[in-house]
Each structure stands twice: as C-alpha cells, then as structure tokens.
C-alpha cells in the first residue's frame, strides 16, 4: 500500500481537495486502484449537525455517513463510493480511544495523545485504506490522504505527529508528502512572493515531515526564478516544485499536474507498477475541459434556496447541474435567489431586492428548489414553485423542494388551504408532510433517514423512469426527517400530480410528476450526491434538457443509446446518434 499525504499551508481553502482528487485521477488513469481519506481536525463526530454557513454542504455517502464536502470531490473525480470511515475527525478518534479506555483495553495505563491518539489515527488510516471503493472488491493500491486546515493549527497537531511516526512505519518507498502552499502576487508590486511558502515548509519540516512535492497555488503561472527560489529555500529539487494557477475549470487541474511530470516522479519515488499510461481517462478529462471553454449556448437555472450567501452550501447541486449542462453542450448560468427575497416582507423592507429576485426568476429557463430545514424562506419557495407550475417552466424539487411542491399543489389545486408540514406547524389541521415514525426528536445528530435507499417506479408512463433508462427501480441517497403523509395520498387520486415512485414497502412517496407540464418533478432523495462528470444525474439532466427544449428529442434517442456514460462531443445540442461519443471510464 502506498500513502500520499496532502497538507496545506498559509491559508485554508487553498484547493487541497481538488489537488488531492486530481492526483488520484492521474494515478487512476495509469491503471492503479485509488482510495481517499479526508481528515478534519474538528471535535464534531461528523458534519451532520453543521450549519451550512460553517462548512458548506453536508455530503451524504451510500452508507449514510454525513461528511465533509471534499469527499464529494473525491467521489466525482475518481468515480468511487466512499464510506463514513473515510472521513476522520478529531471527535471520532477521541470517541474511539475513550471507548477503548472505558472497556479497559489499555489495562490501566495513562491514556495520552502520544502514543494512544496517534496510534489510533495510524491504525484507522491503515485499516480504511484497504477497503475497496470502486465496486470490484479489489484492495486499493494507493491511498490519498488530505489533512484539513493548515500546518501549525493547534487542532491538527496530533495528526501531524501521527504521520511523522507513520512515515517510518510505512517506510519511505511507501509514503509521499505533497504540500500545497500559496504564492501571493500583491497588486501593488505584481511580484510573486515566496516567503509564505518558505515559512510554511519550514513549519512542516520543524514538525518532522519533509515535502516530496510542493504545489504552488497562484493566480498566474509562477516564473522559473520563483520556482528555483522555492527549491533552494525549501530543500527540494526544482522539478519537485510545480504550479497550479487559476484555471477556467477544475477539469484542467489533473491535466496541469500531468503536464508537469508528476506521473514520472510518482513512479520513481514510490516504485509504482506503471507500465503504460495509455488509459483514456485523462483524454476524457481533456475533452471535457476543452468543451467547457468553447461552450456558447447558455441555459439559465434559478436556484431558490435559503443558504445562497455561501456557494459551498449547494456545492453538489451546482456540480450536478454543471455535469448535465456540459453533457448537452450548454454553458450553465446558475442564478442564486434567496427565497426570502421573493416574499412580501422583502417587498416592504427592500423593494429593489424584491424586484431583482423576481426578475431573475422570470428570466430563468428552469427552476430548482433544493433541500433545506426550517420555516424561514418557505413562502418564497412556495411562490417560486407556483410560478413554475402555472407558467409551465421546467422545475425540479429536491427533498424539501418536493414536499413544498406537494403542499403548493394541495393548497392551490385541491383547495386544501391549510395543508402544511408539521415541521413548520406541528398543529396544522392538514398535516400533508409529517415527521417519520423512526425519527427521535431528542437528538439531531444521526437521526435522519440517511444513505442509499431503493425507490420503485409505480408506473411505466414516467419521464424520470425513461431518463433513468426504463429500469424498474433506482437507488439514490437520502437525507431527511420528514415525508409526505401516506394517509393523505388518496386526496391526489385522479389529479394531475402523480406519485410515480415509492420505497420498497410502498409506504413512502419518493417521486412526483405533474402531467401536462413540460417537466415538473420532485424527488425525496438527493440525486446530486451521485452525479459524476461523465455520468450526469438523470433528474438534473432532465431539468437541463427541458430548460433547453430538447427533452423530447433526447427521450426518443434513449431507446437507441446506452444511457450510462453517454457523453456528447458535438458542438451543438443536436442529439443525433452519430454525434454521441461513448466515454466509458471503466
């Protein structure tokens, strides 16, 4: 087993996750089996109870793990399915050690950070690195480990010490350290500064780790003189200093790394079994990156949500939309609308903001209402849903978005004016959305319906069923505490809003579709978590197809084409069979 540790310096949010994912992509393109581990040095057990404004979205895994959004990058780049234990937190490690101490596993010894915490970290990494993540049940050959935060943070000291020890346990030929640092370029001078990187590497070396590769993040390509200066002061060869400057899309990052010879250096330093890197995975990434830059037709989607001030709150939603837009040769114009800005209260307090929000909504080719929690902003979401339904604008509701679509239809089409969710009004006379029976209202952490669940289609006449390839059932990831009340489903009989997907027991409503509408779909699950750059999520793809007026054409072609891994390389949005390029990443 080979271990690649990715650390960061100077500032957080420098792009370690994308760089680590790109490293994994390059190695996978060489025929190697790659897994990934993300270390978050916070004391929380997992990311499940975080505010979206703290760390962005909570990414959900197949096994129900609520983890850092960087694991989403790993899954998308590497096309793998990780587990909750691939996300290590300080809280998990301490909980594990304390539980062992309570059981008496330490035989009365004084439990300390060194060696007990550091040993637990090393054992966790070694055990999880062996777990197969790509479906073929073969053990991974390489584990890419990202250490969150920056070198020098007090929260991460135990992890740095653990890896200082681990490099000797694993042996030099099996352990590799990549340090990602910032090379700022002040506008006043325009000169690229190396001092922050020098200090960061000095701090890293002072803690017992020496970088094998220094990745310099910069706004523009770094000059050779700057690279040589970093090489001299950081005790590495010039070829061990590479640059990742700002690029048009993240699809360029693996290509930048490959162009600078990292494969050859990995092969020599880690003695990797690489004979021929002719795998066409990187070629596909280049195809995607090139196409991304030449897209001209634009598709505008309005995202009506509660957490629009921080884009990372909807990171996977954005990626799923981007994957779908790229697949149909359109540039995505995602317009973020704070749902509360659509409400009358904003009209009274800030008319300009109110009219700007409604102008965005009116200009949108499609409308998306994602998941969320709490009553704030729900009126604005209901108004956006009503607009999409009545104006026949393509609409996709995710989780809460689906629940609100059912409520909006009940209020305005079934004359159930008091229809509501018990999340917003526990005493509502028409509880159309209710708390699930298994939900424990005492604690918030880990009390939701989480992870991969099966949804069975109940009709053959379903747009979404066709988009999924006419399969009898699908499996998607869930994260919710509330569900449509099964006792009130009879109210919708013979109405235009149809429940076309249910759970395996036929008790939970999973998918809704509105007949007579170009595309009005709601899903209780979160399909964005399963979207991949070369395998766009069907519900999101359907939204983009409907928004560009090509849904019917695409559905007609579905009988002739294999849905999985279809990737068009056409310069327009025509869906003729001859213009589809099959990009099989296996």
Swiss-Prot record:
One of its GO terms (biological process) is CTP biosynthetic process. It catalyses: UTP + L-glutamine + ATP + H2O = CTP + L-glutamate + ADP + phosphate + 2 H(+). The active site is at 399 (for gatase activity), 526 (for gatase activity), 528 (for gatase activity). Keywords: ATP-binding, Glutamine amidotransferase, Ligase, Nucleotide-binding, Phosphoprotein, Pyrimidine biosynthesis. SUPFAM superfamilies: Class I glutamine amidotransferase-like (SSF52317), P-loop containing nucleoside triphosphate hydrolases (SSF52540). GO terms for cellular component: cytoophidium; cytoplasm. Pathway: Pyrimidine metabolism; CTP biosynthesis via de novo pathway; CTP from UDP: step 2/2. Its EC number is 6.3.4.2. Residues 300-554 form the Glutamine amidotransferase type-1 domain. InterPro entries: Class_I_gatase-like, CTP_synthase, CTP_synthase_N, GATASE, GATase1_CTP_Synthase, P-loop_NTPase. It comes from the Eukaryota. It holds the Pfam family GATase. The modification Phosphoserine is found at residues 568, 571, 574. GO terms for molecular function: ATP binding; CTP synthase activity; identical protein binding. PANTHER family: CTP SYNTHASE, CTP SYNTHASE 2. Catalyzes the ATP-dependent amination of UTP to CTP with either L-glutamine or ammonia as the source of nitrogen. Constitutes the rate-limiting enzyme in the synthesis of cytosine nucleotides. Belongs to the CTP synthase family. This is CTP synthase 2. It comes from Rattus norvegicus. The lineage of its organism: Eukaryota, Metazoa, Chordata, Craniata, Vertebrata.
